[in-house]
């Protein structure tokens, strides 16, 4: 099991949480982005830079992810692809995308895209908060504890 990070849009504070977890639990964390990323020196942390372009980083994650891997992303279509490959997508606000909820997320995303394309100002997501960071860290810890107990 390893952790993949859709790093172009992942908040730095979430990356910091992942960096600490990588060293503490000796789990591989790989960031994928279309820009150069700075990572702390660690044999458990690496970054993959892909060419710029629409969904290039997402496609690389889908290509590399294995069943049982954790993928950190807020990108709903990427989360759907990860689920298809048996991965576990977790967004930076601490919500897992699952086979039970992914269709609802895809439908809402499509609806909001339609509103925006018709000129409606839908605003954006709420500001990232300390509560979001705690929710993410708690879900991450629970997930990793379950993985360790499986052996």
From Swiss-Prot:
PANTHER family (alphabetical): UPF0178 PROTEIN YAII
Residue spans crossing the bilayer: none
Pfam families: DUF188
Protein name: UPF0178 protein mma_0312
Family according to the record: Belongs to the UPF0178 family.
InterPro entries registered for this protein in UniProt: UPF0178
Organism name: Janthinobacterium sp. (strain Marseille)
């Amino acid at each position: 099991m390893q952790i993949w990070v859709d790093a172009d849009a992942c908040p730095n504070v979430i990356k910091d949480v992942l960096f600490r977890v990588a060293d503490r639990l000796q789990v591989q964390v790989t960031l994928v982005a279309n820009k150069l990323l700075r990572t702390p020196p660690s044999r458990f942390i690496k970054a993959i830079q892909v060419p710029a372009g629409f969904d290039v980083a997402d496609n690389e994650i889908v290509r590399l992810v294995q069943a049982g891997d954790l993928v950190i992303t807020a990108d709903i279509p990427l989360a759907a692809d990860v689920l298809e490959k048996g991965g576990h997508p977790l967004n930076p606000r601490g919500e897992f995308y699952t086979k039970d909820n992914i269709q609802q997320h895809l439908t809402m995303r499509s609806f909001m895209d339609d509103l925006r394309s018709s000129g409606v100002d839908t605003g954006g997501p709420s500001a990232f908060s300390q509560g979001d960071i705690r929710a993410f860290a708690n879900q991450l810890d629970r997930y990793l504890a379950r993985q360790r107990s499986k052996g």
